[in-house]
């Protein structure tokens, strides 16, 4: 009976010592795993033999596996009658570890949000995945898939001039950055990225198109995101200055993501969360070790008393 009470006490002690550990760890990933949008084909694929499901599962496995090594990967799987092409891409400032954490969520989300459709695209804040069954109708790389604009507007303050200058800097930056660029100009943070297999010239054209859409669609809104089929851009204005953050991105290069990345206001909370998670996790490990030693000591004492 004493042993059971001791074990229960240990469990209660762990709950009291680390009640927010799970919350802290989650906060470290939410900045790149938030769902932005989904795109699902209306047609479900007919799969009486299960070949499509097998091909899709194999493709998902391949994409998730590659996300530990690179931020962009495209593959084709299946047979001549069940060909499926799929790809993933992570935001250019994510480390390989964060890229994997982001991409590994996408297969389940795709199945949950779209089911067994002949084409699917799921975009999170840090990565996206898409697949198409052979023969699916193609769309223009300039096609707008999704947009979101901030609710606050600041017309007449010189914001639009600063934003447009930042846009110009970013358009040039994605070329020198070979598909990814992020920077800050006079309190305006901008980020642009093209799909990994898009050349520099086409990338510049796609980003230019997205920036023009942002000017029209979002007007004087202090923030906005425009997602085209082959690229996306995002911007945020901070009147009091863009918050600083410590860099958590990997320095390793990838086929799709390189170039400059300055302070990203959208990830400042996430970077802090990671740091806190590491500290709290370390403390939890030490605390758990101490508790295990105490438990072992009590166990040995009980055995000694029994004799």
From Swiss-Prot:
Region spans: Necessary and sufficient for plasmodesmal targeting: 276-296
Gene3D superfamilies, sorted: Gnk2 domain, C-X8-C-X2-C motif (3.30.430.20)
GO CC aspect terms: plasma membrane; plasmodesma
Membrane topology classification: Single-pass type I membrane protein
Transmembrane segments: 276-296
Biased composition (Low complexity): 246-268
Disulfide bonding pattern of the chain: 40-114, 90-99, 102-127, 149-218, 194-203, 206-231
Superkingdom: Eukaryota
PROSITE patterns attached to this UniProt entry: GNK2
Subcellular location: Cell membrane; Cell junction, Plasmodesma
Disruption phenotype: Grows normally showing no detectable abnormalities in leaf or flower development under short or long day growth conditions. The pdlp2 and pdlp3 double mutant shows altered protein diffusion (measured using GFP). In pdlp1, pdlp2 and pdlp3 triple mutant there is inhibition of GFLV 2BMP tubule formation. Virus cell-to-cell movement is negatively affected. There is a 22% reduction in mean surface area of infection foci by GFLV and an approximately 12 hour delay in long distance movement in comparison to wild-type plants. There is also a systemic delay in Cauliflower mosaic virus (CaMV) spread.
Chief location: membrane
Location of the Gnk2-homologous domain: 33-136, 141-240
Region span, Disordered: 246-270
Tissues with expression: Highly expressed in inflorescence shoot apex. Uniformly expressed within the inflorescence meristem with the exception of a boundary zone between floral primordia and the meristem where the expression is weaker (at protein level).
InterPro entries, sorted: Cell2Cell_Antifungal, GNK2, GNK2_sf
Swiss-Prot/TrEMBL GO biological process terms: plasmodesmata-mediated intercellular transport; transport of virus in multicellular host
Role according to the record: Modulates cell-to-cell trafficking.
Sequence similarity: Belongs to the cysteine-rich repeat secretory protein family. Plasmodesmata-located proteins (PDLD) subfamily.
Assembly notes: (Microbial infection) Interacts with Grapevine fanleaf virus (GFLV) 2B-MP.
UniProt protein name: Plasmodesmata-located protein 2
Originating organism: Arabidopsis thaliana
UniProt lineage: Eukaryota, Viridiplantae, Streptophyta, Embryophyta, Tracheophyta
């Amino acid at each position: 009976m004493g042993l059971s009470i001791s074990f229960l006490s240990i469990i209660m002690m762990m709950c009291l010592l680390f009640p927010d550990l799970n919350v802290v760890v989650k906060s470290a990933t939410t900045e790149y795993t938030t769902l932005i949008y989904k795109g699902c084909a209306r047609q479900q694929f007919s799969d009486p033999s299960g070949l499509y499901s097998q091909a899709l599962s194999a493709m998902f496995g391949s994409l998730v596996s590659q996300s530990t090594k690179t931020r962009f990967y495209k593959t084709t799987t299946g047979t001549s009658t069940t060909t499926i092409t799929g790809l993933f891409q992570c935001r250019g400032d994510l480390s390989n570890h964060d890229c994997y954490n982001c991409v590994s969520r996408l297969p389940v989300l795709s199945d949950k949000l779209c089911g067994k459709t002949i084409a699917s695209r799921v975009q999170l804040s840090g990565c996206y995945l898409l697949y198409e069954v052979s023969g699916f109708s193609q769309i223009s790389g300039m096609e707008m898939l999704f947009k979101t604009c901030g609710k606050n507007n600041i017309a007449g303050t010189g914001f639009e001039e600063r934003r447009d200058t930042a846009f110009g800097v970013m358009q040039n930056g994605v070329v020198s950055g070979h598909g990814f660029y992020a920077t800050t100009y006079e309190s305006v943070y901008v980020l642009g990225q093209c799909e990994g297999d898009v050349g520099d010239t086409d990338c510049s054209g796609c980003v230019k198109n997205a920036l023009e859409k942002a000017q029209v669609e979002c007007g004087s809104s202090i923030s906005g995101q425009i997602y085209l089929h082959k690229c996306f851009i995002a911007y945020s204005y901070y009147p009091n200055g863009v918050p600083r953050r410590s860099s958590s991105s990997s320095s390793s290069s990838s086929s799709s993501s390189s170039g400059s990345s300055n302070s990203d206001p959208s990830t400042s909370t996430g970077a802090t969360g990671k740091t806190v998670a590491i500290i709290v996790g370390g403390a939890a490990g030490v605390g758990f070790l101490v508790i295990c030693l105490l438990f072992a000591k009590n166990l040995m004492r009980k055995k000694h008393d029994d004799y």
